[in-house]
Regions:
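Acidic, metal-coordinating catalytic segment for phosphate/diphosphate chemistry
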Residues: 1-44
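Short loop segments at secondary-structure junctions
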Residues: 11, 40-43, 54, 129-133, ...
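Short, well-ordered strand-loop elements centered on a beta-strand within folded domains, enriched
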Residues: 13-18, 44-52, 135-139
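Nudix hydrolase/Nudix homology domain
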Residues: 22, 61, 67, 73, ...
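Conserved Nudix-box catalytic region and its N-terminal flanking loop in Nudix hydrolases
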Residues: 23-33, 45-83, 87
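Short secondary-structure junction motifs
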Residues: 45, 60, 93-95, 134
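Internal catalytic-core helix/loop-beta-alpha segment
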Residues: 75-113
Length: 184
């Protein structure tokens, strides 16, 4: 089944045009995504849940956002984030539980499996407090190879140093850190 996305303008607002997801990435059409970060507190420190991307996905085998996804045409950020959370990790949440961290524009050019990839995302970064263990999650095997709770500051340090295989933006982690500290 083909997935269609709203093409957005320089402010991240839908233009009325839609495009198939694969074409959006091949041609670099700007579109919307949601990034939902799960956090918890352990021993007085904030931890973040990372998902390890499936080997068949873009950025194969990399640690990434707890749950993320493209916003289907005609839909909005929050319902999409909740849907992706259920699909990828088997968790449910209410929109009122999602804490906005900020908005970002992400530009990324790469090649995956021999195919050019031009990503132009307008992203809403969200946070969800989730006092759960890894074995309480139901992973979507087509998308996620595993998960890892990690101290947020350690994650930030390792991403900055390049000592963890990841596709995480350090700027996004700063947004998550600020929102987590403000709501802890």
């Amino acid at each position: 089944m083909k997935e269609y996305l709203d093409v957005v303008d320089e402010n991240g607002m839908p233009t009325g045009e839609t495009v198939e997801r694969s074409i959006a990435h091949r041609e670099g059409f700007p579109h919307r995504t949601s990034h939902l970060w799960l956090v918890r507190k352990r021993d007085g420190r904030i931890q973040v849940l990372l998902q390890k991307r499936a080997m068949t996905k873009s950025f194969p085998g990399c640690y990434d956002i707890s749950s993320a996804g493209h916003i289907p045409a005609g839909q909005d950020y929050y319902p999409s984030a909740i849907r992706e959370l259920k699909e990828e990790l088997g968790l449910t949440a209410k929109e009122s539980e999602l804490i906005p961290c900020g908005d970002m524009k992400i530009v990324w050019d790469d090649v995956f499996f021999g195919i050019p990839y031009h990503d132009r995302q307008y992203t809403k970064v969200l946070l969800l407090w989730a006092d759960i263990e890894e074995d309480q999650l139901t992973l979507q095997k087509e998308e996620v190879d595993g998960v890892l709770w990690i101290d947020l500051q350690e994650c930030m340090d390792r991403v900055a140093a390049g000592t963890i295989q990841n596709c995480i933006s350090p700027e996004v982690l700063k947004l998550v850190q600020a929102a987590a500290a403000a709501t802890a």
